[in-house]
Amino acid sequence: MIKLQNKGVTLQGGVPTPAEAVFPAGRDKTMAYQILRRHDRPCGDGSMHLTFDSLISHDITYVGVIQTAKASGMTEFPVPYVLTNCHNSLCAVGGTINEDDHVFGLSAAVKYGGDYVPANQAVIHQYAREIMSGCGRMILGSDSHTRYGALGTMGIGEGGPEIVKQLLRNTYDIAAPEVILVWLTGQPPQGVGPHDVAIALCGAVYKNGFVKNKVLEFAGPAVSQLPMDYRIGIDVMTTETACLSSIWETDDAVAEYLAIHGRPETFTALHPQDGAYYDGMITIDLSRMEPMAALPFHPSEAVTLRELIHDPGDHLREVEKRAEAQFGGKAGLHLTDKLVNGKLMVDQGIIAGCAGGMYDNIAEAAAILNGHDTGSGYFSLSVYPPSVPVNLELMENGVQQSLLASGALFKPCFCGPCFGAGDVPANNGLSIRHTTRNFPNREGSKPSDGQLAGVILMDARSIAATARNHGVLTSAADVDYTPPAPVQRRFDRNVYDRRVYFGFGHARPDAPLKYGPNIAEWPAIPALADDLLMQVASVLRDEVTTTDELIPSGETSSYRSNPLKLAEFALSRRDPDYVPRAKATQVLEASRAAGAVPPALAEVLRSLDLPESALARMHIGSVIFANKPGDGSAREQAASCQRVLGGCANICYEFATKRYRSNCVNWGMLPFTLAEGAAFDGDAGDFVYVPGVREKLARGDEEFPAVLVHKGKAQPITLYLKNTSAEERELLLTGCLMNHYAAQNRR
């Protein structure tokens, strides 16, 4: 189905051809570089310094973004900035705090000149597709699934501080990325949907890092054969491959989509130029695709549904082993209990949001369920359309009525099932979902309370087939159904014109920001000291640590407008002792600053053979060790929560994503790495001493000799800060992005 070629490729006469040599200049002929160059402010340093046509955030990120930008000197939004309300839109946790955030968001749109999309009108990425996309554009979003490549728009998802930089008229700085050609051939068989293709792609490239921090460029004869919703459904899942961004060839289907959405002038035909050079190629033969499943706990745990249905026991036992390895005795997952007479019984089906909720997916699900029902047992099916305009189409064409008659439930335009804020399964429940992720606990369970559930990612088509079989896992390839007849798509913009606040270009500086009692300013962040003494607050030896583990989503997201309250939940579902340990380190630092030397600190000084006078040059903070932290969400709070608890660094072998590393840097946490194969023997409570860290960082050193104090004994280790730009070093020296810009404003 999928072939990887880890060698250079050029397009010659529209045909991929092995490149005889590396030809970086040929990247300028790719669609990606044609767009990137137009958005670059070159500084002669070989990096790209990008500006964006528009920005977008949702209601669990925009408060922090605006608070940071305000503290950094922002007076108005210089580019279109859209604030959507699709994550905490249930307003079901914490009393008034969620709606308080929404009120704050509207007041910020009025004051600074932004656009505000009220709750339940649209999920963030569907609104961007319908209203903001256009060929050759670039959009930066504070959500990792900011992907609009199928519409000719390069989307990048980053943490909130990168949005802040754009609001302050600065740039998004990256090394010039490699580009991977994704060559599509064939036509997918009936019953195979975009999520099947996406899961297979994730399975092929995630674990080997084949596309990490690269741009995926989709081309080939099959592109023109795919409907727009199909392309969009594949594209949004490219985030799960760890790539930087994506772009697709554009054609008449894209032109029609943009025209239907009232923006025909934003269409431009995009194609690679002859001689375009790619750093590798992925060939996908769609005709050989099968319905797929991504087992817990990652979209890359790909297996064909055919295999899973034929031999469920072995696959489920592997999942149980992964759960046992991660959660130990805190919570158990016993999915083999779901086997009844050799068949796998699932408890719940969800079709939702920016990946699953598109019109075509829901219409196909309705066709599969037509004349059937979901049963009256434990299994339930819920459908979340991505926007009110799409929901109106589903109603007008009878799709919604058909699904309701079959026993499915329609719910608001809401991202909840994707991050644990809606339709949380029962303990030991098994949910099949056409959503973006199935990380541990992302469905909402709490291992610290003995809860655990599992999510298998599947396409809407096979979810509907399973619903038709009353919860018995079923592939859409194994059911007979008549696909829905093509319909003339339409878009009713009046929905938005009547409800959305369009404020760009109409800032009202005298208008007040409206604060609820939970919305708090960022606490003071210290600058980097001459020497650094770090106490290990958590050691995470899992292969990968996700941002969902670093700061859980779900109901805790309601507290993201209050940095100190939110920090209480840091690592709560992975290492509940992290917060108490980090706070204990803060007490040590407070004692040092007051001139006291507690016994624990005196013991560390003896191990390091340092006099008490060395404390005057030192800062004491906490540090997390993880093998590979930062997969998943763009949420800056994965880093900021550590920072407000006194965190000053991460130590790892590599960062899972560029965006998490950027979040650490923007919050002033040193992104230390270890050499491949180097041991880190530290345990929670141990110390790491980095002498001269400020001086070395200021002069651009990459190697930082350090000392690990483990069980009272000092042992040398070497930490690295590689590929750190001059601006990143300045942010780290000043303590965080806010401090950096505040200092600039004072000058």
Each predicted region: which residue ranges?
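Fe-S-dependent hydro-lyases/dehydratases of central metabolism
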Residues: 1-747
